[in-house]
Amino acid sequence: MLIRCFHIKMALVTCFHSMLFLSAVVFIFSLDVNIRGVEASHQVFPELQSVSAVNVQLVHRTGYHFQPKKHWINDPNGPMYYKGFYHLFYQYNPKGAVWGNIVWAHSISKDLINWVALEPAIFPSKPFDKYGCWSGSATVLPGGKPVIMYTGIVTPSPVNTQVQNFAVPANYSDPYLREWIKPDNNPIVRARSENSSSFRDPTTAWFDGVHWKILVGSRRKHRGIAYLYRSRNFLKWTKAKHPLHSKDRTGMWECLDFYPVAPKGMNGLDTSVTGQDIKHVLKVSLYSTRYEYYTVGEYDRDNDIYVPDNTSVDGWAGLRYDYGNFYASKTFFDPDKQRRILWGWANESDSKQDDVQKGWAGIQLIPRKLWLDPNGKQLIQWPIEEIQLLRGQNVHMGSQVLNTGEHIEVKGVTAAQADVDATFSFKSLDRAEWFDPNWAKLDALDVCDWMGSTVRGGLGPFGFLTLASEKLEEYTPVFFRVFKTKDKLKVLMCSDAKRSSTTAEGLYKPPFAGYVDVDLSDKKISLRSLIDNSVVESFGAHGRTCITSRVYPKIAIYNNAHVFVFNNGTEAITIDSLDAWSMKAPSLMNNN
């Protein structure tokens, strides 16, 4: 039946209908189950967490993404710009390649590309963080003085009682901020009536002229909650009478982020900026699904209430920064270039045994600049401009027609480590397939799973075959498929790892997908992919939809990797322009 559904279009429709009930049932039971959007960051492997790497394997290790020299990393923490340096703290296991022994590792950079690792900034050492120093944020106070707030664990697993602590630099004149002090009056925020084992990840604070305010993520049964706290001096905090926002059937909210966005233009705003036309973004990382969701809405500063716009779906069906392997993200305002920058973590999709063997696990994705789409409904994301410093050999293609079933290789670049940016066009929208209304009840990845890159369509599938072997035994397709409904077009974007590796066992190879809110009246759409050995970060329609995949090819590695442009729709596709660059490694990557 599966083979028939995959190859026969009419059977596909039947299979979709038969799966609707199953999908609904699966969701009901998924609230407390990890469905591996990203694997749990706090999953414990006691027998592995202190197994230090002897040899670091380079196969599948990224060439230009942020990684420590070895071992495990997860959440980005407290990013900021201070005295000419970008600072990134991150959850790190100095003793092994799985989660455990977590400290706040610390790296600095002048350009967000080249990084120098310093000594860990925060590590368990006092009663208020004896059993762990978990995620948090940085705030720059008046006078340019940074302060970190983080979650401390005060009882051992499985209880993991959580409190909120602060730390300050030992020397404000040190631009490297090499040493941090944890004052003895910690913790400064304790759970009272809140769930103390689900109470973590304080946000960057904002100032309303009288009070500093932060959010702490939590839950009450299946309701996700953003608790709000106020302080006049950043030391004594009082919980507000009501949360800033909450939502039923979403489970634990962790790694919250809350910040303003300008209604027009691409510049970012300081976290404390408010105004009549200013929109706000609330992002939550859902522990139950391992995906992140955000809404765009209005912040009532006087009453400390956030209300998502009517056009912004609140909950598990809402907008995501990234529809793939992307979690625990954190933004910060860069005052040097007046932009808001997004950091996100991508975990591995292989086995824990693989991670221990190769000696490392986890990467931080390329930082992205964020701004509000002119339509006001969603964010646009784009790799920071500094990534262009790593571009090498360039190849250009233009006015190239792709007929049904054709694929063309992009030659002349290192396909295992490349930046590929293309604009596609088509003469007509008439051949777009009809979108069955019942499919709206399915997640986009279900549609992608059944209607993949090899299933003949009308307008699409078309896009890239990344990290591909010469004979296509392995490849990770990133592509669009255009559907039509009675009143509009619906664009599906996919990054499908099912054929990414001939390795049969131990790998998680899912299809990831999201819909693209884009105007196709000019019959054009763009696609950009950052390819780096075991990661493919893709940006559809100039960053309106983003998808990250982690893949582990067995054949398509190093010089045996290829990248193709393909079309498997009946409508001919034109490559208006395509530029591809070989990507060099940074000169400095955490002392590696």
Swiss-Prot record:
Which InterPro entries does the annotation name? ConA-like_dom_sf, Fructan_Metab_Enzymes, Glyco_hydro_32, Glyco_hydro_32_AS, Glyco_hydro_32_C, Glyco_hydro_32_N, Glyco_hydro_beta-prop_sf
Q: What is its EC number?
A: 3.2.1.26
Instruction: State the reactions this protein catalyses.
Output: Hydrolysis of terminal non-reducing beta-D-fructofuranoside residues in beta-D-fructofuranosides
Q: What is its main location?
A: secreted
Tell me if Secreted is a UniProt keyword of this record: yes
* Example GO molecular function: beta-fructofuranosidase activity
- Localisation: Secreted, Cell wall
Span of the signal peptide = 1-40
Q: Where does the record say carbohydrate is attached? A: N171, N195, N310, N347, N568
CDD domains registered for this protein in UniProt: GH32_Fruct1-like (cd18624)
* One cellular component term from this protein's GO annotations in UniProt: extracellular region
Show the active-site residues. D75
Q: Which UniProt keywords apply?
A: Cell wall, Glycoprotein, Glycosidase, Hydrolase, Secreted, Signal, Zymogen
Might you name a Gene Ontology BP term for this protein? carbohydrate metabolic process
Q: Which function does this protein serve?
A: May play an important role in phloem unloading and in stress response.
Could you say which protein family the record assigns here? Belongs to the glycosyl hydrolase 32 family.
Record protein name field: Beta-fructofuranosidase, insoluble isoenzyme 2
- Organism encoding this protein: Daucus carota
